[in-house]
Structure formats: structure tokens, C-alpha cells
Amino acid sequence: MSHPALTRLRALRYFDAIPALEPHLLDWLLLEDSMTKRFEQQGKRVSVTLIREAFVGQSEVEEASGLLPSESRYWLREILLCADGEPWLAGRTVVPESTLCGPEQVLQHLGKTPLGRYLFTSSTLTRDFIEIGRDATLWGRRSRLRLSGKPLLLTELFLPASPLY
């Protein structure tokens, strides 16, 4: 099962450099902290609608080519992050199977827990980059993050109800 928001997320086209945008947009798109926390700061109750969690082959995560190690299996998690029940963000996390050793195995068992609640409590979290993307009227971003040096790719699409707009 997929969702129209995830189709739009996969259609994002990324800028080669950070574009000259309004400060308000850049404030959201370049946020280095947890988007879950940012939504909660808006006075909202944040919840996750889980669309898909499964191991997939390389052909289902082509956007990760060149950004993550080439492996036969990846853990894929697709969600909608909702504020007071309204979808504000679509998220897609691609995790190489080799990342899922040690404490990082918990990434397979997040269920309806927001990814940010786990990632941003880890003292081993680093971010290699943030790229800004756009699909028609919607903005998004992707980041390669590392836990204990092990990579994962997080792509986020800001939906029309999001305060980014």
C-alpha cells in the first residue's frame, strides 16, 4: 500500500545548492533538530500514521543509490507525521541492513513512534547533509544521518497543512 503524499515525496527534485528562499522557508527546511519536536512546539499533539515498514531490495530505494552503501536489503519505513490528526509531513527512511546492528536494531521496531524521538536522543547522531527539494508546490528535504557512524537516509515532504506554507 502506498499513499499519494509518498508518490509526491519520491518525485522531489533536489537543488544543487541551498536556494535563495524566504527566511521562514529556510528555517523549516534547514532545521537540524527534530521535526517532531518542532511540530510539538507549535502546540500540537504529534502522531504517526504508519504506511509501510519492511525490508526491500535495491530496486525499491533507487533514490539512495550513491548516498548509502550498496546492499541487497534495506529497511524501509514510510509514514505520515500528523499534528492533531492532520498530516503535516510525509517521511521515508531508508536504512541499509548493515546499519541495523547493535542499538540501531530499534529502528526496525519504531512502529508509531516518531523517528525523531529516537534519533535526537542519541549521543551518536550526526548529519552529513541536508538537501532541499521541490515537487510542484510542495517543499521537501533529505538528509543522510549517521548513528554510531552507520548511515541512513531520511526524506521528508512538507504537506499543504504544514506551517511551512
Curated annotation (Swiss-Prot):
Q: Which UniProt keywords apply?
A: Cytoplasm, Lyase, Pyruvate, Ubiquinone biosynthesis
One of the entry's Gene Ontology molecular-function terms is: chorismate lyase activity
Q: In which pathway does it act?
A: Cofactor biosynthesis; ubiquinone biosynthesis
A single Gene Ontology CC term? cytosol
GO biological process terms held by the UniProt record: pyruvate biosynthetic process; ubiquinone biosynthetic process
Domain of life of the organism in this record?
Answer: Bacteria
Gene3D superfamilies per the UniProt record, alphabetical: Chorismate lyase-like
Enzyme class label: lyase
Please name the Pfam families in this protein's record: Chor_lyase
> What SUPFAM superfamilies does the entry give?
Chorismate lyase-like
Q: Which reaction does it catalyse?
A: chorismate = 4-hydroxybenzoate + pyruvate
UniProt: substrate binding residues: 35, 77, 115, 156
EC numbers for this chain: 4.1.3.40
Concerning PANTHER family, the annotation shows: CHORISMATE PYRUVATE-LYASE
- Assembly description: Monomer.
Q: What is this protein called?
A: Chorismate pyruvate-lyase
* The species this protein was found in: Salmonella paratyphi B (strain ATCC BAA-1250 / SPB7)
